[in-house]
Amino acid sequence: MISPSVSAVGRDPAYGWLMVFVVFTLSGLSFGALGAISVFLKPLALEFGWGRAETSLGYTTIAFSSALFGVFWGYVADRWGSRWFGVVAALTMSFSLFMLSSLTSLFQFYAFYFLFGAFGNAMASTPLFANVGFWFRHNPGLALGITASGGAIGQGIIPYLVGMAITSNGWQWAYQAMAVSYLVIALPIAFLVRESPRREIARLAPEKEVRHFPLSEKEVVIWMSFAVMFCCNCMSVPIVHLVPMLTDASRSLEFATSVLLVLMLAGGAGRIFGGKLGDVIGALPTYIIMS
């Protein structure tokens, strides 16, 4: 195993790039399940007679629980680290998906997706993204861009595979296949999650940081939260309704998921480009340009 030690001066630790791979994969799986809701939407609505709005609320449920618990897990990570976040997320994601394969009510549908968001997506995304950032001094934008691209790529690949599974064997088998695959892929690599030595030092012996930015940290968080909230709202609504909209227009499920795949692959490439651009011109100018 690559030692998670501080590298030579002028280079980022090699283990940091392994962390990029780990979190890329975990976030790809977790966000992929969000995107897959758009593929499950019509089969579940037909199976149980649910309305389109009721079924799509599953996406809202998982997004809400992810946001709510993401704040809490961020606090926990700052206090005690995120060493075991990946393991808990892997087990929760697999369990939730397996239970969804045998759901019989709308309440169960919401409950299991809430669980997926609270202890799966919320633990596999934001706190581990922050973990990755602490590993890098020289290429943080590129590292985080590659890491974040996992969520976009996962939202393209997972729905595409789920669409094929539903077409071949039905929605229940598709959920079961996801559960087994998530456990096999996510659990082994989750044990590779480590804290960077720099973050451990900062957490155990915090130092007063000299600030030159005109706004306080709290003000920055508030404004960035509003920006991200409106950005993600505008992005997520088309994602969850794209596949049903295309199949309603008499397009095949394979075609619909292919369109989503192309869209999200482009999104992944954009995140990598934006991350590298941030290393060159700075984070704020890049955010303005990409917006």
Language model features: what each stretch is:
Residues 69-82, 270-282:
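Helix-to-loop junctions at the C-terminal end of transmembrane segments
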Residues 27-28, 96, 107-123, 229:
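Hydrophobic core of transmembrane alpha-helices in multi-pass small-molecule transporters
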Residues 15-52, 69-73, 158-159, 235-243:
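Extracytoplasmic
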Residues 35, 63-71, 155-156, 264-272:
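Residue-level signature of mid-helix packing/kink "hotspots" within the transmembrane helices
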Residues 146-197:
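Helix-loop-helix hairpin linking two adjacent transmembrane segments in secondary transporters
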Residues 44, 122-136:
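Intracellular juxtamembrane helix-capping segments at the cytosolic ends
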Residues 37-42, 217-276:
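Extracytoplasmic gate region of multi-pass secondary transporters
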Residues 91-104:
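C-terminal ends and interior cores of transmembrane alpha-helices
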